[in-house]
Amino acid sequence: MSEHIYSVSQLNQTVRVMLENQLRQVWLTGEISNFTQPVSGHWYLTLKDENAQVRCAMFRMKNMRVSFRPQNGMQVLVHASVSLYEPRGDYQLIIESMHPAGEGLLQQQFEALKMQLAAEGLFAQHLKKSLPPFCKSVGIVTSQTGAALQDILQILRRRDPSLQVVIYPTAVQGKEASAEIVQMIELANRRQEVDALIVGRGGGSLEDLWCFNEEMVARAIFHSQLPIISAVGHETDVTIADFVADLRAPTPSAAAELVSRDQQALLQQLVYQRQRLEMALDRLFKQKDDRLQRLRLRLHNQHPQRQLSAQKQLMQQLAHRLDWSMQAVLQQKQAQLRVLWARVEKNPLPFTLQKQKQDLAQLKVRLDVALKRELTFKHHQFAALCTKLDSISPLKVFARGYSIAQNAQGVAITQLKQVSVGERVITRLADGEIVSQVTDLRPRS
C-alpha cells in the first residue's frame, strides 16, 4: 500500500491542526444547553440550533470578562476558535468572548468600526491633545436630567468651586442622540468658552450606550479643537468614543476629578512651598550676615585710624626707650663723678687736690662731650624713626591732597554701588572732615 497509514492519534492531531489553521476564529450564534461550571472556574456548554450542536469551552480568564451569567436556553453570539479535543476525537469551540444574541450583532458592528477607525489613525496616541495644567472652565456634553451630570457637578463643587461649568445638554440614548452629541461638540468648539469637554453618561446596556459607538460621534471627537474626556458608563463599559477621545475616564465622577484641582491639596502644597522659601531665605540671610560680619572685622583691622594708633604706640615706645637710655648714661657718669669726688676728699694734699681738680675738669669736659655726642646720636635716631613713621602714616597721604570717603557707619566707600543718591557721606582730609550729601552718581565711562 502506497497510501499513508495514520494512527488514531496522528489523525486527530492532523485534523486539529487543519481546523485551527483553516477556520481560526469565527463568529457563531446559537442556543446554550448543558451549561456547567466546575471548581476550576471554566465554562463548558453546548451551542445548538434546530439541526445541529457543537461542544464549547470558555476558560476562566476569558469568562471573567462576560457581563452576564449564561443560562440554558439563552441565545448568544460567541467569538471562538475551532479546535479538536484529541483524546476523544471531539471537535469543539474555544470561546474568546460571549454576548447576548441581540448585543452580539452590535458587538460585531463595534469591532468592525473599531478596526476601520484604527486603520485610519483616529486612535493614534501622538494625535491626542493634552489637558491644560489648570482648567479655568469645563464643558459637559450629557443629559441635563441624568444622574451623571449631578455626579460631575457634585465632584466639581467639592474639589474646585472656582471652576466655571458650561452644560451642553443633549440626549444620550436613542436614535437622535448621536446627532445631538455631534452638534454640542461642534457648538462648544465654535464658542471656545471652555478649556476642555467631558462627553459621557451613566451606565447602561450596550444598546443604551450605542450612540457613543456611532462613527459620526467618533469623528466629531477626533476633529475637536478642544481636548475631550470620554466618560461613558462604568469602568467595564468600553465605547468607540473612549478610543478616539484624548483621555478616557472610567466614570463621569472620575472625569470630574481629572479636570478639577483639589483645593485642599493645592493649599497644602502652597504651605509647603512657603515653608521651603522661608527656610531658604533664613539660610541666605544668615550667610550674608556672616559675610558682613567678616568684612566689618577686616575693615576694622585695616582702618587707617587703627594703623595710625599702632604707629603712635610704637613711637611712644621708642621715645620711652630713648629717655631711659639717656637717664641710664647720665646716672652712670654721675656715679663715676661721685667716686672721683670721694677720692679727692680723702687726699687733702694741695698737689693732689690740684691734680684731682684738673682730672675732674678733664672728666667734666669729657662727660659733657660724651653726653652731647650720645644725646645727638639719640636725637638722630629719634628723628629717623619719626621720619619713617611719618612716611607710612595715612595722614601723609592726606597731606598730599588725597582723602577717604566713608558712609554714615564709618565704612570706607570704594565703589559707586555702596552709596545711593540722597545718602550722607563723610570725606576725611588731613586737617578735618567734610560732611556732604550725594546728589548724583557718575560711573567711569
UniProtKB/Swiss-Prot annotation:
Superkingdom classification of source: Bacteria
GO terms for biological process, alphabetical: DNA catabolic process
Assigned keywords, A-Z: Cytoplasm, Exonuclease, Hydrolase, Nuclease
One cellular component (GO) term of this entry: cytoplasm
Subcellular location: Cytoplasm
Uppermost EC category: hydrolase
One MF term in the entry's GO annotations: exodeoxyribonuclease VII activity
EC numbers: 3.1.11.6
Catalytic activity, as annotated: Exonucleolytic cleavage in either 5'- to 3'- or 3'- to 5'-direction to yield nucleoside 5'-phosphates
Main location: cytoplasm
Secretion signal span: none
Main function: Bidirectionally degrades single-stranded DNA into large acid-insoluble oligonucleotides, which are then degraded further into small acid-soluble oligonucleotides.
Subunit structure: Heterooligomer composed of large and small subunits.
HAMAP family (alphabetical): Exonuc_7_L (MF_00378)
Family: Belongs to the XseA family.
NCBIfam families per UniProt: xseA
Protein's name according to its UniProt entry: Exodeoxyribonuclease 7 large subunit
Organism: Pasteurella multocida (strain Pm70)
Lineage: Bacteria, Pseudomonadati, Pseudomonadota, Gammaproteobacteria, Pasteurellales
